């Protein structure tokens, strides 16, 4: 029985493909015939031992005059090809079904032993998003041409936030100023470009219309960083808040915005536009900031943004979020919490960093739920108004927003 057919192409005068069929598991020789070689006979043949690639090369070089350098290169390729065939599954493996279990890629075994290839811990697994409210929100977002950070950032909580039975308890985080950021933080999956498209002038109106349709009790507006705009998009975001308050006056509005390159006048515009919660994320501890965030975003600059918002409108709830699993230490997290309390930040959230793609920075550690509980207790002990802490918690997390909503409603009743 024959199972392999090998073709050899000789370069020279009057050349054609010369083929030989090789019997598996034997050292027998078979003739290689050609009708195109410049030999004394039209039916010239050379007997070549199949199992020895060196003898194959020597025999063929006599017919073609192949140079020593070319012979060496051909010999190496034939040897590599032969080795690859020998390492691969045999016909018997295919018949028995063992072939599917064999590792053909030599790098695959190495990948299987890396931390990234291991299965996620059970506490990081979530159900597939579904439900009437989920599909309703998803349809409206598409119809009105809006972007949501829930989708763009691949948030694991989208099913929980969008799919609640009570529509007034559902939460959506709408991303304004387009879906392309001018910065390139190493943890973020949002698209980046130095010159994104111009902001949609109808976006504030369309966003307000969507919020009115959904009847949400709480909405989060976030933006990509727009360093290409003079005001960083502050006026566009502020106008959106005002439109929402006009069309859905009972909806509480949180904005999660950037640092506006440290321009505190833009922070003033945002703080005074009528929003209820001013959020800006530190993302990580000070020592890791240069490695995690874009070089234009600094730890101290972010603290100054939160501090200025609180100073401008003291009744505002200020909020930030920190990712765990990036290699931070307990001492560094404690110092970060102290820095936040020194500027009177009200709310902090802790969540597990999860690598969006292989192009992003690796996860250093999957932090256990018990550790998240510990940081929640520490934050409350230090005087934070609220702390949402858990592996799947994100800055705009439904449970945290429900608490803030109740706090704000009580304030309004007074």
From Swiss-Prot:
The keyword Transit peptide applies. Its main location: mitochondrion. [4Fe-4S] cluster 2 binds at residues 181, 185, 188. Its cofactor is [4Fe-4S] cluster. Residues 51-75 are annotated as: Disordered. It catalyses: [[Fe-S] cluster scaffold protein carrying a second [4Fe-4S](2+) cluster] + N(6)-octanoyl-L-lysyl-[protein] + 2 oxidized [2Fe-2S]-[ferredoxin] + 2 S-adenosyl-L-methionine + 4 H(+) = [[Fe-S] cluster scaffold protein] + N(6)-[(R)-dihydrolipoyl]-L-lysyl-[protein] + 4 Fe(3+) + 2 hydrogen sulfide + 2 5'-deoxyadenosine + 2 L-methionine + 2 reduced [2Fe-2S]-[ferredoxin]. It is an enzyme of class 2 (transferase). It comes from the Eukaryota. It is found in: Mitochondrion. Pathway: Protein modification; protein lipoylation via endogenous pathway; protein N(6)-(lipoyl)lysine from octanoyl-[acyl-carrier-protein]: step 2/2. Its EC number is 2.8.1.8. One of its GO terms (biological process) is lipoate biosynthetic process. Belongs to the radical SAM superfamily. Lipoyl synthase family. Present with 1630 molecules/cell in log phase SD medium. This is Lipoyl synthase, mitochondrial. It comes from Saccharomyces cerevisiae (strain ATCC 204508 / S288c) (Baker's yeast). The lineage of its organism: Eukaryota, Fungi, Dikarya, Ascomycota, Saccharomycotina. The gene is LIP5.
């Amino acid at each position: 029985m024959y199972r392999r057919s090998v073709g050899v192409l000789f370069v020279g005068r009057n050349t054609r493909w010369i083929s030989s069929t090789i019997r598996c598991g034997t050292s027998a020789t078979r003739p290689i015939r050609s009708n195109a070689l410049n030999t004394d006979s039209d039916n010239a043949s050379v007997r070549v031992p199949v199992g020895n690639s060196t003898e194959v090369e020597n025999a063929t070089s006599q017919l073609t005059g192949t140079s020593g350098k070319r012979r060496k290169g051909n010999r190496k390729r034939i040897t590599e090809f032969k080795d690859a065939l020998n390492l691969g599954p045999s016909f018997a493996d295919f018949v028995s079904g063992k072939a599917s279990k064999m590792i053909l890629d030599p790098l695959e075994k190495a990948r299987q032993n890396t931390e990234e290839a291991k299965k996620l811990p059970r506490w990081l697994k979530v159900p597939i998003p579904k439900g009437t409210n989920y599909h309703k929100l998803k349809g409206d977002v598409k119809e009105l041409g809006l972007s949501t950070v829930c989708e763009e950032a691949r948030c694991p909580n989208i099913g929980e936030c969008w799919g609640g039975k009570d529509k007034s308890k559902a939460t959506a985080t709408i991303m304004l100023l387009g879906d392309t950021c001018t910065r390139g933080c190493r943890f973020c999956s949002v698209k980046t470009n130095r010159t994104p498209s111009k902001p949609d002038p109808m976006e504030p109106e369309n966003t307000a219309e969507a919020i009115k349709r959904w009847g949400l009790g709480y909405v989060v507006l976030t933006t990509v960083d727009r360093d290409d705009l003079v005001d960083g998009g502050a006026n566009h975001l502020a106008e959106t808040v005002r439109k929402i308050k006009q069309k859905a006056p009972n909806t509480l509005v949180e904005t999660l915005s950037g640092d506006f390159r440290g321009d505190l006048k833009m922070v003033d515009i945002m703080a005074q536009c009528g929003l209820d919660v001013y959020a800006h994320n530190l993302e990580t501890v000070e020592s890791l900031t240069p490695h995690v965030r874009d070089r234009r975003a600094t730890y101290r600059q972010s603290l100054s943004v939160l501090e200025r918002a609180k100073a401008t409108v003291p009744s505002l709830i200020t909020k930030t979020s920190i990712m765990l699993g990036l290699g931070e230490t307990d001492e560094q997290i404690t110092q970060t919490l102290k820095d936040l309390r020194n500027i009177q930040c009200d709310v902090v959230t802790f969540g597990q960093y999860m690598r969006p793609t292989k192009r992003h920075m690796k996860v250093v550690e999957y932090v256990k739920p018990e550790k998240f509980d510990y940081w929640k207790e520490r934050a409350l002990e230090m005087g934070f108004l609220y702390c949402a802490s858990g592996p799947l918690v994100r800055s705009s997390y439904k449970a945290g927003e429900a608490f803030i909503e109740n706090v704000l409603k009580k304030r309004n009743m007074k």
